[in-house]
Swiss-Prot record:
Pfam family, one: Eryth_link_C
Source domain of life: Eukaryota
Organism expressing this protein natively: Lamellibrachia sp.
SUPFAM superfamilies according to UniProt: Extracellular hemoglobin linker subunit, receptor domain, LDL receptor-like module
InterPro entries: Eryth_link_C (IPR031639), Eryth_link_C_sf (IPR036153), LDL_receptor-like_sf (IPR036055), LDLR_class-A_CS (IPR023415), LDrepeatLR_classA_rpt (IPR002172)
Glycosylation sites: 108
Protein name as catalogued: Giant hemoglobin linker AV-1 chain
Length: 224
């Protein structure tokens, strides 16, 4: 049978379909490039924030006296006790910044920690769980947030799994951004959780000898 030539309307329709396909393909390519750019920009911003924080932390260690912190990017140092007390002590008001004064260890929050090293605990736990059982919500302009905590320890002995549950008092210091758990046992080992000022969902937990202040174990905690 003879091939019938395309009508004008059919030819126009085919051309429109081809153009639509090309436009759709270009749109998808552009979106992919745009998404990749957004990801790169986001990573760069995040990396920049972390780099700035690391630099500031390094400067804090060498710039300000013990129990003092820099007022953000300012060279001014301020006592830990002046942070988040409702009074602007830093010239740039960094000490009362709403992000700086967040208390990440809220009531009913749970934090699971895994050992980086352990040279001193009795049980040598492979997992430690800190649960915040109570945190007063009416304390706004207080440098120290009092807490009640439960510490669950999971360990192994002779191939058998063991667990222990301890209860005690703790405090979150807004100035130093530290969670301090008083020694829950007679060995007088306290837990000091140090937040980095960037991520509120994790912290380094140090086991510290109460009398000397020496760190003898470290756990990495993550919010659940």
């Amino acid at each position: 049978a003879a091939v019938q030539p395309l009508s004008v309307s059919d030819a126009m329709g085919a051309r429109v379909d081809a153009q639509a396909w090309r436009v759709d393909r270009l749109t998808k390519q552009f979106q992919a490039i745009s998404d990749a750019a957004d990801t790169s920009i986001g990573a760069a911003k995040s990396g920049g924030d972390i780099a700035r924080h690391m630099l500031n932390s390094h400067l804090d260690d060498h710039w300000c006296p013990s129990k003092y912190h820099r007022c953000g990017n300012s060279p001014q140092c301020m006592s830990n006790m002046a942070f988040c007390d409702g009074v602007n002590d830093c010239k740039n008001h960094f000490d009362e910044d709403e992000n700086r004064c967040v208390v990440p260890v809220t009531a009913n929050s749970t934090w699971i920690g895994y050992p980086a090293y352990d040279h001193c605990t009795q049980r040598r736990p492979y997992e430690m769980v800190i649960s915040i059982t109570s945190a007063p919500s009416d304390i706004v302009y207080k440098v120290h947030q009092p807490l009640k905590v439960q510490v669950d320890l999971f360990s192994k002995k002779g191939g058998l799994k063991q667990s222990a549950s301890l209860h005690g008092d703790a405090v979150y210091c807004k100035g130093s951004q530290r969670l301090i758990v008083a020694p829950p046992e007679d060995d007088r080992l306290e837990i000091i959780g140090q937040f980095d000022g960037v991520s509120n969902d994790r912290f380094k937990g140090y086991i510290v000898r109460e009398m000397s202040g020496d760190k003898c174990a470290e756990f990495r905690f993550f919010k659940q």
